[in-house]
Amino acid sequence: MINYNIYRNNCSKEWVTFVHGAGGSSSIWFKQIRDFKKHFNVLLLDLRGHGKSNYKITNAFKKKYTFSSIANDIVEILKIEKIKKSHFVGVSLGTILIRHIAEDYPNMVKSMIMGGAIMKLNLRSRFLIKLSSFFKSIVPYIWIYKIFAIIIMPYKNHKESRLLFIKEAKRLYQKEFLRWFKLTSEINPLLKLFRQVELSIPTLYVMGAEDYMFLESIKVLTKEHKSSKLLVVPNCGHVVNVEKPKFFNNHTISFLNSLSK
């Protein structure tokens, strides 16, 4: 079982579950907790191999990592805590996991907030994955993470996100990195399915105006999917919740509150 923390709000029956990306941990949401727990019950979790769901715990996972099995780790926590339905907030690869949960367990997902969402890999990102695949067993994994961080978050105003990304990634083990990296083999057909199949779940995509790797595909997606909305954050890169926390918190909480009216 993965590590998780709960912040209860006795004045609310609504739950919000936060899902971080690859190489991160629940600590990336530190700028969200204070505001969100004023309005909702909050569930924070560390994906397998990340944060306090460390290597010793993940030794229990003998089988190959898949998006389905990792998504089921999250669903297991909701079932243990008897959370029948939750809003989900994710960033980067965490948005893929949330979308996977919505596909398999639509009745458990009240809404989706997708920060720095990955729904299609452009030519540059596909090349980056292929290059990393070649070097992953040759060089220390942290080198690959640093290259990813620089390419995905290249500008000066992305520095905080970039350094946080690298800091969190250093806590991973090399073997754990390789397990997660193998997920890239199933990512393209999965994302294609997500783009083709629209769910009726209210979805807000929150994308940085400078997220040149992933923004354009989300613009196309939100024009085609009626249940989806796009919010573009000015002067912001990939990790929107870290770079522009006030903007992110105000707009996402407003979105969630609007659903209950």
Task: Give names to the regions the model predicted.
Residues 199, 205-207:
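Short beta-strand/loop motif that positions the catalytic acidic residue
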Residues 236-249:
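Catalytic histidine-centered segment of alpha/beta-hydrolase-like enzymes
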Residues 90-94, 98:
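Gly/Ala-rich beta-loop-alpha elbow adjacent to hydrolase catalytic centers
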Residues 34, 43-89, 250:
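Active-site loop/oxyanion-hole signature of alpha/beta-hydrolase fold enzymes
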Residues 123-125, 142-197:
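Conserved alpha/beta-hydrolase catalytic His-Asp/Glu region
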Residues 103-104, 109-139:
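Flexible "cap/lid" loop of the alpha/beta hydrolase fold
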Residues 5-59:
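Conserved HGGG/HGGXW glycine-rich cap/lid loop of the alpha/beta-hydrolase fold
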Residues 212-218:
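Conserved alpha/beta-hydrolase "acid-adjacent" motif
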